Amino acid sequence: MKFTLGLGSRAWRVSWEGAAAAAAGPGAGGSALRCRAQRVSSPRLGRRGSRLSGALPLCLSRGGGGAQALPDCAGPSPGHPGHPGARQLAGPLAMEQTYGEVNQLGGVFVNGRPLPNAIRLRIVELAQLGIRPCDISRQLRVSHGCVSKILARYNETGSILPGAIGGSKPRVTTPNVVKHIRDYKQGDPGIFAWEIRDRLLADGVCDKYNVPSVSSISRILRNKIGSLAQPGPYEASKQPPSQPTLPYNHIYQYPYPSPVSPTGAKMGSHPGVPGTAGHVSIPRSWPSAHSVSNILGIRTFMEQTGALAGSEGTAYSPKMEDWAGVNRTAFPATPAVNGLEKPALEADIKYTQSASTLSAVGGFLPACAYPASNQHGVYSAPGGGYLAPGPPWPPAQGPPLAPPGAGVAVHGGELAAAMTFKHPSREGSLPAPAARPRTPSVAYTDCPSRPRPPRGSSPRTRARRERQADPGAQVCAAAPAIGTGRIGGLAEEEASAGPRGARPASPQAQPCLWPDPPHFLYWSGFLGFSELGF
């Protein structure tokens, strides 16, 4: 016998005082307690009573030297006509219960089992007599929710039996339904459970009463069809072995030609389809003209040399000179490099382009980084005012000019043949050109951070100009000027002017080209590419 009687439970005992007062009668003050004597009173916490005291309500009275049960406890109370006894039916039923638990009201119940039919019938009878459900709950020691549920079911269906009225729901996951669900899933792997339910109704497999729910279909797909869809070990052994995955298929997404195929042959197969040979080479089918290989010029090189063949280690290792030529093919066609060695020009190859090519980078380089299209020197003005027309730039190849200590070999062909260091006007062969407008001594240059020195300020230039004008003028130039400052200034100007109306040696009129050596190599202020950080 199982009785879970802990500290939280209540062991109901019969109050001897209440029973004695009920037996004494109204004269002894028992009229007020007569009704209460029929029920269990005074619950006491923490005290364990006997099985009968917890389940069998007895109304005891004192008489005959012992306690005896009152015969009218199960019947109506004299003070309350029509009110039946509180424990008229609970006594025999409780005696039949051999196991169970005790609820808060003191009644014995079995968890998970329905209430006995006799108690159900008694609840309905008491309700028909007009007793409130709360009073029925206290009298029969049944929870209020159970009483209300039984009465509501009786009012709706007229039945006091537990469980569903029409019986349990019939089985819906029949083998036929499972077979159709499997067929639907195999035909369309992405089908939803509610779509399967609609197709079962549309095909007449089920009707609206026995069609499985969406959750049932999902459970069938997960438990039954999911396990059946996976092939067994025997079925897996019959399948052909999968092709080995190439290690670089996920990088190169386009078809590859086979090394045994003819040179330049192209394949149109899909990347995942294996080719005729066991090895694959570099790609040949290019999606667009803006790929990385086209930008670097690899496609042009490959079209000239054909598809590379060989082992995987040598398929991607061309010679260095071929790659150097590949890098040049990406640029526009430019003039020849005049016999210079390729390694010497690898670092500066971008600067040997024509002026039109270099003008494209004008937004990224400073103004003094490259000369203008008609300018041969860095510190000179446009060359048309000083140089005679010559062959196009760069001219034919000439003898190399490589003075000792020069870092880069410069060939004479890179300098214009007509770019002499002695102007024809100073030699007297041609008339003097028109005078140019005079500007301040510090003239504008392409690089404002380095102002150009005044023209004619070098002693070597003045001495050479005086020797060219008159060999006997050196003594006059060395002697101090006699007279006022005005006379001395005029004498110096006349001495430096030279014969035949040559141009005066003023800073504004002095040309930019230095006599010797070449100014763009030996001038200390020349802005080379090394100074620009290239």
UniProtKB/Swiss-Prot annotation:
Residues 101-157 are annotated as: PAI subdomain. Keywords: Activator, Deafness, Developmental protein, Disease variant, DNA-binding, Intellectual disability, Nucleus, Paired box, Transcription, Transcription regulation. Residues 176-224 are annotated as: RED subdomain. Residues 98-224 bind DNA. It is found in: Nucleus. It comes from the Eukaryota. Transmembrane segments: none annotated. Pfam families: PAX. Gene3D superfamilies: Winged helix-like DNA-binding domain superfamily/Winged helix DNA-binding domain. This protein is a transcriptional activator. It may play a role in the formation of segmented structures of the embryo. May play an important role in the normal development of the vertebral column. This is Paired box protein Pax-1.
